[in-house]
């Protein structure tokens, strides 16, 4: 679970880091990053949901010992996921302006969100491939690579956010554009790391990764039958957040800034639960593949208890040290104090 935790942390570090740095730029940048980032994540969750179906199939083949069947799932899933990414990028490059204009009323927030989003969506080309590599390594239970990848992506993102947003280390001062571009480059570095590691360290022949073959639509449909509901679930969970932020945007920049800060804390708190959920998917699939169906319920009970206890500890820290945690995102005293009550509400919800 720990390497998976770090892998999910790295992906969320991109959004959290953007929020933390832009919080020191101003409320408009913070609000625009919230709207643009959520819109990006809404689309990204479709690919993430698809990768969950691939991960379940890969884990099943791994549990059965049918290692040669893993490669076709990986490569066919990657081809379809990348195709989705290219198609969605093309559509959003054309439709981004009228779509964002429809969703946002403030001209100031609109222009900043549009600037952020049209740079950020280039990350689809890399993020949609990265989710498949994560599915592969979680499915075959070689999760240590996720730790290394997480460190690479987080370091690249933090450094470039600092350099590009504020114009440090010889970079031009790009503000909100810098945050978006830094995130894209971090995702590209993650994909490059996965490719180099896979070809350098993994037995390609054993896992059937040494050949792609022709595009197999039947294989893609099998993955989609498993993942379609997960794709919808993840999309709706993010879409609800986006609708909430749309409502707050109509109340004003201050309310939007507070919501983005508190949501960022919520995302970090949710990572242990997500990592345990991902672990459960893989372990259950491996158990079923190896014939250990009887142990599934006991395993799930153990993971659920662990998840709740971890969340109790995280919530307790937030309740005891709210201002210390929120100060990561802003040095404005009034904004910090106004964010504390919302943080308490989120903490209560996390235990549910």
Report residues per predicted region.
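Short alpha-helical transmembrane segments in multi-pass integral membrane proteins
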Residues: 1, 58-125, 171-228, 284-349
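Transmembrane helical elements of multi-pass membrane transporters/channels
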Residues: 3-15, 119, 153, 186-190, ...
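Generic alpha-helical transmembrane segments of integral inner-membrane proteins
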Residues: 5, 9, 13, 17, ...
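Helix-terminus/linker motif at the lipid-water interface of multi-pass membrane proteins
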Residues: 9, 13-31, 100-107, 163-174, ...
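Small-residue-rich hydrophobic transmembrane alpha-helices
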Residues: 19, 30-90, 127-146, 240, ...
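Small-residue hotspots at the loop-to-helix junctions and early N-terminal turns
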Residues: 27-38, 113, 117, 180, ...
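Short runs within selected transmembrane alpha-helices of multi-pass transporters and secretion channels
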Residues: 51, 55, 120-139, 146-157, ...
């Amino acid at each position: 679970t720990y390497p998976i935790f770090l892998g999910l942390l790295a992906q969320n570090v991109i959004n959290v880091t953007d929020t933390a740095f832009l919080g020191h730029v101003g409320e408009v940048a913070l609000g625009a990053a919230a709207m643009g980032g959520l819109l990006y994540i809404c689309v990204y969750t479709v690919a993430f949901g698809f990768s969950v179906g691939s991960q379940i199939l890969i884990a099943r083949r791994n549990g059965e010992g049918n290692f040669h069947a893993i490669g076709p799932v990986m490569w066919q899933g990657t081809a379809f996921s990348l195709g989705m990414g290219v198609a969605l990028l093309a559509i959003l490059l054309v439709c981004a302006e009228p779509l964002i204009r429809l969703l946002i009323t403030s001209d100031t927030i609109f222009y900043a969100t549009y600037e952020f989003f049209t740079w950020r969506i280039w990350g689809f080309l890399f993020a949609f491939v990265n989710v498949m590599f994560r599915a592969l390594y979680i499915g075959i239970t070689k999760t240590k690579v996720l730790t290394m990848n997480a460190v690479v992506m987080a370091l690249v993102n933090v450094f470039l956010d600092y350099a590009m947003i504020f114009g440090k280390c010889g970079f031009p001062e790009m503000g909100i554009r810098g945050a978006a571009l830094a995130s894209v480059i971090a995702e590209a570095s993650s994909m490059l790391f996965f490719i180099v590691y896979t070809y350098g360290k993994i037995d390609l022949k054993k896992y059937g990764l040494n050949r792609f073959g022709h595009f197999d639509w039947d294989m893609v449909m099998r993955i989609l039958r498993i993942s379609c509901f997960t794709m919808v679930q993840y999309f709706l969970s993010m879409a609800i957040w986006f609708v909430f932020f749309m409502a707050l945007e109509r109340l004003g920049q201050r309310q939007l800034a507070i919501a983005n800060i508190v949501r960022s804390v919520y995302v970090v708190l949710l990572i242990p639960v997500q990592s345990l959920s991902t672990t459960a998917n893989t372990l259950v699939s491996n158990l079923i593949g190896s014939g250990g169906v009887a142990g599934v319920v006991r395993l799930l009970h153990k993971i659920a208890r662990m998840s709740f206890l971890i969340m109790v500890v995280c919530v307790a820290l937030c309740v005891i040290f709210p201002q210390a945690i929120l100060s990561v995102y802003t040095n404005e005293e009034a904004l910090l104090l106004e964010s504390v009550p919302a943080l308490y509400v989120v903490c209560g919800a996390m235990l549910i």
